[in-house]
Amino acid sequence: MMRFSKIIFLAFLFAISCLTVPLFAETAPVSARKDNRIRFVNYDPYNVTQIIGSIRSSVQLEFADDEEVTYVGIGNSVAWQVAPAGHFVFLKPREVQPVTNLQIVTSRQDGTKRSYQFELQVREGDVSAGNDTYFLVKFRYPEDEALRKKLAKAAEAAQREENFVNDVFNIHENFGPRNWAYEAQGSSLIEPASVYDNGKTTTFTFLGNTEIPAIYLVSLDGQESLVPKSIKGNKVIVHAIAAQFTLRRGNDVLCIFNKRFVPEGINPETGTTSPSVQRRVNIGNGHEG
């Protein structure tokens, strides 16, 4: 009975020792497919990365492109030579000595920092492929890559939505409600073939290779001003509506009058010039979308 109790007690002590004694192990970088001297490792600030250098060869550490090495600390500067350069660090073992450590801190463009821990080992012998030696250790950043993909996906979705909205506006520009009630007075040499508006923009159409005149918006007090416009083929789309426009080319002058001018434009009850695109007000952040 006493012997059985002793066995149970020893087993209990062993179990407790397994729970209370932590296990330490460095991370060995993964070999590249074509050459085992090229290595890759995922960044983890709480991992120690193993580096094996060989006499008469150097090891290159490569961090993210947006990082710059700002601090390097090494346990044995006699056995190892360290040379930081931008987001790289070059290591050269000088002599075979016991294992030591290397600590590197980098600064990123967004102001944050990253910390790296290394265990350095030196070996002698052949440095050709197939031997246990490192030439390049490149860090990978899965979280950064996942974030880049997420942002790229969101940007693509936003672009698709913008393209869809533009397509809808173009449809209603071409096929939506129009005001054709315009009259012209002045030189027929610069008279457009047609003029209409959709409540937001005014479109002037010219024939053939006609030299397009300057188009001025005339305010209610008679002042003329140039306004933004787009040219699509033989059409000039002025990004405004007005009671009067004045066209000028050299000595030729033509006045265009909007006989059905409505200052607020066409209202399709959506807050835009398209009945298919609605304007949304976000109360929470005080912005309109």
Curated annotation (Swiss-Prot):
Compartments where located: Periplasm
Region (Disordered): 267-289
Keyword Metal-binding part of the UniProt annotation: no
Domain of life: Bacteria
Biased amino acid composition, Polar residues: 269-279
Entry keywords, A to Z: Periplasm, Signal, Transport, Virulence
Signal peptide residues on this chain, from the entry's feature table: 1-25
The UniProt record lists the keyword Signal: yes
Gene Ontology, cellular component aspect: periplasmic space
Subunit: Interacts with virB8, virB10, virB11 and the 15 kDa protein that is encoded within the VirB locus.
Family listed: Belongs to the TrbG/VirB9 family.
Role noted for this protein: Component of the type IV secretion system VirB/VirD4 which could be a major virulence determinant for subversion of human endothelial cell (HEC) function.
Name listed for the protein in its UniProt record: Type IV secretion system protein virB9
Source organism per UniProt: Bartonella quintana (strain Toulouse) (Rochalimaea quintana)
Gene: virB9
